[in-house]
Amino acid sequence: RELRRLHLVEDALERLYNSGRFRLTLAYVLARTGLRPFDLFLMAGEWAEAQGGMQRIGLEAYTACMWTFFRGLKGIEPAGLRDAMACDILHSRRGGFLPACLYREDGRLKKLKRAVAFQAGRGAGGVQRAVVILESRKEKAVVAEYADCDPVTGWYPLELVEVDRLEKSLY
C-alpha cells in the first residue's frame, strides 16, 4: 500500500512539477491551500487514480483533469487558478492555445491578437506571439513571445500588459 502511494506521488510530481508545465499553478495552489508539496502530489495522484488513471492521457485532457481537481481544493479561487494555468501554458507551449477548460470568450481578444501580431511584425517574418486576458484582473493581459526560450527552464518570456494600452497600439 505504501509503495503504491509513493508511485502515485511520483507520477503526479513528474507530470506537474518535473515537466515544467505547471510550476506557476503549483505555486498558486500551494500558497492558497497551505498544503505541503508531498501532500498535494499524493492527493493529486490518488484523485487521478480514482478517475481511472492518467497513464495514457494527453496533455490537454490532463490539464482539464487537474483544473477540476485543483478547483475542488479549499482556498482556491477559480479565476486565479485559471490565470496561473493559462500563464503556465503560455510559458511552456509554443503557440499559446488554451485547452477548452481554460478558454474564456472575450470580445476584446480578437483585437488584442491583432495588436500583438502587428507589434511583432509577424507578417514580415517576425516573432510569433500569443495573448490571454486574465480572468482575475480583466484590465490586464499576458503576452507571450515565442522567439527564444530560456535554456534552463524551457520557458518562453511573458509580459503583463494593460489591455487598454494594447488595444490602443493598433491606432
Task: Label each residue range with its predicted role.
Residues 6:
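Conserved, mostly hydrophobic/aromatic
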Residues 1:
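Acidic/histidine-rich catalytic neighborhood
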Residues 12-171:
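Radical SAM enzyme core and accessory elements
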